[in-house]
């Protein structure tokens, strides 16, 4: 069951209290492109986080190791989601697969201790804001919300499109300019009343305006931006899913282009070479693609997988979340921070 990040100016969290709608972008263009040679020098992302210098993309069949301290206790099944790394700490959402999908935000420190930070949170995907707070895609109130990590207070950013609540906001990517791109499938729609007539990918401008990026992907899930912020990636579609790329010009997403077929896609991460790390939930693996959609590597885990983020001292540790578990693997390339 698939369930399902860039700096966010503080102003957007205090201003985006209402939203209006725009028409969806044009349908995807399915033309192919000839993949160029894989780069070996890391680019610098839009926020300046990627280090310059040599980098090596993963290749072949790899396996991530489970972080035992993060294992969920025996009992009701749980799903970990939306990992973000900051100041030596991994934060992620942890929700129960039961009525209402009750959720909390967990903190996994460098000392290996797992602590509950905020409960309840109603959260799924997470992103780090400029002021150190967390931006969360939530299903309890069907909104994007801002959480203060010190006092746990919550503030709505946006919660509806054309007068109706979202379905169950799932994952997001935040541009250096403060634009939020997020997916709205129906996986946790039953957590609260109301919803949309379709599942969609949305854009939230810095002025609070909500517009549709794509409504042709069934249950869009993972979403990420290229290091330079000029391409948006979205994965969704279930068993016969798709990884789709959209050029961003003047802050708006253009027609999408299908890069690869993916099975039960969930969350994503991007490295500083621009490679795309797409999880395949019930396939219990992550696949690494170059920006043209050519597969470079697979990373296996031992349970259903949901999402991914880079962290660690040099940002070369890939952390993976899934069914009551967190995994990690060291790579030869740093990640583009979300």
Predicted regions and their residues:
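Sequence-structural signature of mature extracellular/luminal beta-sheet repeat domains
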Residues: 21-24, 30, 35-338
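C-terminal motif of bacterial Sec signal peptides marking the signal peptidase cleavage site
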Residues: 17-19
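Bacterial N-terminal signal peptides that target proteins for export
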Residues: 1-9
């Amino acid at each position: 069951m698939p369930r399902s990040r860039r700096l966010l100016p503080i102003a957007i969290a205090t201003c985006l209290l209402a939203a209006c709608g725009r028409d969806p972008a044009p349908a995807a263009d399915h033309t192919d492109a000839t993949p160029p040679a894989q780069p070996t020098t890391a680019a610098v992302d839009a926020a300046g986080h990627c280090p310059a210098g040599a980098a090596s993309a993963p290749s072949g069949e790899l396996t991530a190791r489970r972080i035992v301290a993060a294992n969920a206790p025996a009992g009701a099944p749980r799903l970990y989601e939306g990992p973000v790394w900051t100041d030596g700490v991994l934060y992620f959402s942890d929700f129960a697969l039961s009525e209402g999908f009750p959720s909390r935000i967990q903190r996994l420190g460098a000392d290996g201790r797992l602590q509950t930070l905020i409960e309840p949170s109603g959260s799924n995907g997470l992103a780090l804001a400029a002021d150190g707070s967390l931006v969360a895609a939530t299903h309890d109130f069907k909104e994007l919300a801002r959480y203060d990590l010190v006092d746990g207070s919550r503030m709505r950013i946006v919660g509806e499109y054309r007068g109706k609540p979202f379905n169950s906001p799932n994952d997001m990517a935040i541009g250096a300019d403060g634009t939020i791109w997020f997916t709205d499938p129906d996986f946790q729609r039953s957590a609260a009343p109301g919803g949309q007539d379709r599942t969609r990918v949305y854009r939230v401008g810095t002025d609070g305006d909500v517009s549709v990026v794509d409504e042709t992907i069934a249950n869009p899930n993972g979403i990420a931006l290229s290091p330079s912020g000029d391409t948006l990636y979205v994965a969704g579609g279930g068993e016969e899913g798709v990884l789709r790329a959209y050029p961003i010009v003047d802050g708006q997403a253009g027609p999408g282009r299908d890069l690869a077929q993916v099975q039960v896609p969930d969350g994503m991460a991007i490295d500083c070479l621009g490679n795309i790390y797409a999880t395949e939930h019930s396939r219990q693996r992550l696949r690494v693609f170059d920006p043209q959609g050519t597969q470079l590597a697979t990373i296996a885990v031992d349970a259903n997988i949901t999402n991914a983020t880079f962290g660690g001292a040099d940002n070369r540790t890939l952390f993976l979340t899934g069914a009551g578990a967190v995994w990690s693997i060291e790579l030869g390339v740093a990640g583009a921070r979300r």
